[in-house]
Amino acid sequence: MAAKEVVFGNDARVKMLAGVNILANAVKVTLGPKGRNVVLDKSFGSPLITKDGVSVAKEIELEDKFENMGAQMVKEVASKANDAAGDGTTTATVLAQAIVTEGLKAVAAGMNPMDLKRGIDKAVIAAVAELKNLSQDCADSKAIAQVGTISANSDESIGQIIATAMEKVGKEGVITVEEGQALENELDVVEGMQFDRGYLSPYFINKPETGSVELDHPFVLLVDKKISNIRELLPILEGLAKTGKPLLIVAEDVEGEALATLVVNNMRGIVKVAAVKAPGFGDRRKAMLQDVAILTGGTVIAEEIGLELEKATLEDLGTAKRVVITKDNTTIIDGNGEQAQIEARVSQIKQQIEESTSDYDKEKLQERMAKLAGGVAVIKVGAATEVEMKEKKARVEDALHATRAAVEEGVVPGGGVALIRVASKIADVEVANEDQKHGVVIALRAMEAPLRQIATNAGEEASVVANNVKNGSGNYGYNAGNDTYGDMLEMGILDPTKVTRSALQFAASIAGLMITTEAMVAELPKADAPDMGGMGGMGGMGGMM
């Protein structure tokens, strides 16, 4: 086992804080409408220009092991916020840096780290409850467009296109983002169906940059049983090899020899294939398989209706224009089923909804109906260059996550105002001692940090802006986009409640743990072995007699 270096107390905390600051300072320049871009070097291709906090955070690795630990913990804050709400990563990073900085000052002054953490936790619990009270429903298309605009760094065209997409496929509909061919953004609404089952083996992936499987004009085989013997699939695979088209297998499960053979055939390029489990369980699975069959114009191969997999032909398979499979979801776009049959199936499900007495069953039936009758909206991002395309696509994806979060939990005034208003209402949280009280104060000060950073990035004096906003009430705040004060909701500056809540919770959780650090352990850097010295020249050989 390699030797380790251990640092204690203040030495450890100073190193950790240095790492936190390096990462947070790189991320926080992107915050707000006047935030700057960060350029990321790539080992291949052109550099990536981004204003997305989590993209910047993920690129940072520091040479010093102890500083790197601090940076990695803040990176975790950004990643968690991104996973939970899809946005708010920069806000979370700024909050974490503020809590760690203030917390470590208090620890250096002799306060108890555990009590400080308890105080911070109490303040955050109260703040989250207060955020829910402050939250308003995000019901209309205008509010959705405003949320999308703010998340896409004040790009109104992105906010508008997302609002239109949600209007067309419904708030629960499936919206995907793709790279377009034009200079402008375009919206395509395609009939399609998505269900929550991903690929059965990562070896099916053919788009490594997105970690997904994409099949163009595939056949779709639907089987209501487990497939473990490859012999059952041979007739279909042989027929398929002649057509040169890909195949999507949707079955109860594909395992053992069958899965291994499919993977090998796929990797060798003999047959382009992907397999996923059928959605749902029991009777619901049978019904959902039938939905997919009607959508794609195929037949469900089930022994209970006298159909055997070995005797199946290409006529039994459904077809679709495109299938996209990720780790968690499968989307079938433009199935070639007959419209009359799809409409009949939708009206049949409507009838079942009316007759059902169970709320759970009704919800599941409505989901099925939306998938059959709704569709998939595809936002095609337009740009002049590949570098701009990547940057714009990341912003559209962020905006989409933010609007979904807004529909889910509502919206609060944006621009850091919500946290300022919440902080003013929770100053008297009940605590057990003075150190816990200081923990609450640390959390309250940190809640000002996002607004201060937005003002700093806009070239304003942060303290002046923060005081002006604190002296106001309700939705009164600072619009950094045009350097004015006013009602944030009227100016269309909204943040999803879920994004603000997640940012605060994850920042406090990880920053609180960092404050309580007393020792750090890391491997010693390996000393490079010296190069071998040059070998002396060989002496000449004596003349031979």
Curated annotation (Swiss-Prot):
Main localization (coarse): cytoplasm
Residues reported to bind ATP: T30, L31, G32, P33, K51, D87, G88, T89, T90, T91, G415, D495
PROSITE patterns: CHAPERONINS_CPN60
Highest taxon above the source species: Bacteria
SUPFAM superfamilies: GroEL apical domain-like, GroEL equatorial domain-like, GroEL-intermediate domain like
GO biological process, one term: protein refolding
Gene Ontology MF, one: unfolded protein binding
Record carries keyword Transmembrane helix: no
Subcellular location: Cytoplasm
Keywords assigned: ATP-binding, Chaperone, Cytoplasm, Isomerase, Nucleotide-binding
EC numbers on record: 5.6.1.7
Catalytic activities: ATP + H2O + a folded polypeptide = ADP + phosphate + an unfolded polypeptide
InterPro entries (alphabetical): Chaperonin_Cpn60_CS, Cpn60/GroEL, Cpn60/GroEL/TCP-1, GroEL-like_apical_dom_sf, GROEL-like_equatorial_sf, TCP-1-like_intermed_sf
Ranges in a coiled coil: none
Recorded GO CC terms: GroEL-GroES complex
Family: Belongs to the chaperonin (HSP60) family.
Subunit structure: Forms a cylinder of 14 subunits composed of two heptameric rings stacked back-to-back. Interacts with the co-chaperonin GroES.
Official protein name in the record: Chaperonin GroEL
